[in-house]
């Protein structure tokens, strides 16, 4: 879905999908910066630009930066074949896969916090069975959850893919890169090589 120009966020969901009632988006910082600067930091223009992207692409995939972000929302429906049996309708989750590959339809865009890359929003998103997510505890503030989850997708994928004896090289040693290096070492144990550049 990521290289696709447009995704189909139409309902109903399929049996192996999860429907999320969107509460907020956390855009990739480069995407937020590009939108803010191109709109002169004007809230109304930024809201319109984000709405235009989502309407035209069926996902939040900034065509200039190529990046997305993550979202927080409540589980609205669980497909009969969705693989996680611990979820129930109403649970609050944060996606750990990019908005650039998450089918998304917005019905409203509220306040935008450029410094935090946060966009208050309403609508729905569809998470595929392969999509990673985190179920959020009730006592964890959403702002904190988004900051943590925004970089957690990459390490989650590394943890699933890295195997003992492999050579894993991570390009970029920012927050996501360092966490990915730790995940690789955890998955491989003491065998294999972990390289960070």
Give the label of every model feature segment.
Residues 11-26, 37-100:
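Glycine-rich beta-strand-centered segment in the early N-terminal region that forms part
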């Amino acid at each position: 879905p990521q290289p696709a120009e447009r995704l189909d966020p139409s309902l109903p969901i399929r049996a192996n999908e999860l429907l999320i009632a969107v509460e907020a988006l956390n855009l990739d910082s480069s995407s937020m910066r590009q939108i803010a600067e191109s709109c002169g930091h004007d809230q109304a223009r930024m809201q319109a630009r984000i709405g235009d992207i989502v309407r035209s692409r069926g996902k939040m995939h900034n065509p200039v930066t190529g990046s997305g972000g993550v979202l927080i929302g409540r589980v609205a429906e669980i497909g009969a074949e969705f693989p996680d049996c611990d979820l129930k309708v109403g649970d609050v989750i944060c996606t750990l896969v990019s908005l650039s590959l998450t089918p998304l339809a917005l019905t409203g865009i509220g306040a935008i916090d450029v410094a935090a890359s946060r966009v208050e929003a309403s609508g729905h998103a569809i998470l595929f069975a392969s999509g990673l997510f985190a179920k959020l505890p009730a006592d964890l503030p959403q702002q904190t959850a988004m900051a943590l989850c925004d970089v957690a997708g990459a390490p989650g994928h590394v943890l699933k893919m890295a195997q003992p004896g492999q050579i894993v090289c991570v390009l970029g040693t920012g927050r996501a890169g360092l966490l990915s290096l730790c995940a690789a070492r955890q998955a491989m144990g003491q065998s294999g090589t972990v390289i960070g550049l």
